[in-house]
């Protein structure tokens, strides 16, 4: 259901149409209406799942005019541009002109997760050995599939109606630290007991033996691979920032105040290399670990995550990384 320009706000959602018997909303995104030298004209579209009965009910309401005297219906219908299916080109994004094959993420609409027939259709179109793809599903949510694909596979999948999007699957990346790497640290705080309020940090590890961290940081190893010095340095800096804030302007003779929180540092990087490109990218295994920790530690209500897939996250583009974090934050 494509909206007219300038009707992107949530308040313009065509709720009356989406509540027609047999029609269920399953998400939304932005779309491009037109391109010109002046720029792109964009608006919002809403995804809906339906059946022949749902379409029949909608057709009857439109043709019979039974809701035409309802002001809300009038206002909502007038903001709709078209009702149609996504074009194949709208489902594939983020690939360079030279891309030939590699790791991709396939996103399918929610209802396919409970539909064995549609799932079999998808796997037939995917046509890959079991070690070449990994599927992660969420109750009442999208299905995400990391896979090793080529152009031919993408072209087959693009014609599959339940497909929402396909984009490259980025590898895990921790950004370089900004500012000076070395300066004389202030005097460690007085120990007055471990604060009960705990904050979780997912990163490349932390040196919990440092005087500033040893009483306030608990290190948890979630990967069997030896920590990388640069990743540990990054995680150590993050833990320091959580406990003390910005230290750059503190003098070396100034004693720090005792932190009011303590930190659980979860080292999820580097991930173990197995020879399987999906596992070796590190992204899906890291998401699995983050979800498990957050679900198992309900006593912790705040977490910090300092890494993500390499490259920009396209605005309004759904991925398992962004979806999982949004879901965990609820």
Can you say where each PLM-predicted feature lies in the sequence?
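Short alpha-helical segments and helix-capping/turn motifs at coil-helix boundaries
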Residues: 91, 149-152, 182-188, 245-250, ...
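Calcium-regulated, polybasic anionic-phospholipid
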Residues: 7-16
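Short loop/turn segments at strand-loop or loop-helix junctions that form parts
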Residues: 101, 107-111, 202-204, 265-271, ...
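Autoinhibitory propeptides
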Residues: 15, 20-102, 106, 110-112, ...
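Eukaryotic intrinsically disordered, low-complexity regulatory tails
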Residues: 1-6
